[in-house]
Amino acid sequence: MVILKARQWGGSTVVEMYMAWIQAVLATGCHAIVCGAEKTGTQVVLNLYSDMLTHYPEELWEGETMPRLRTSRGIMQLDGRDNRVYLAASTNPNAVRGVDASLVHLTEAAYWKATKGKDPWDTVRAIYCSVAMA
């Protein structure tokens, strides 16, 4: 699914919550990549996932315990679900090369800057090579 959107209407939040719900409730072994102009900009995603887990009704969890969110070196892990979210920056397309991802969110892509020897499209190609075609 591709969503082209205007800024500040909530589309990114909807995408992130949908991805978080899939990972927290529906699927195991379902990894995601979130890439922004800067890696620090993807901190918003971490906050959204944390908020979703904090406020998700406990009685709706099918497992014995609600999954916890652990973070380490740009990777968020949902304990008990075998799902990860890889946070990446558009300036480093090789950072997620080889990741087995099912979900991708390219955020603020219009603001991705070209750097010496790297074009934003290099990042898009690197990320989409990580998505298995079913």
Model-predicted segments: where are they?
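Phosphate/NTP-binding elements of NTP-utilizing enzymes
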Residues: 1-134
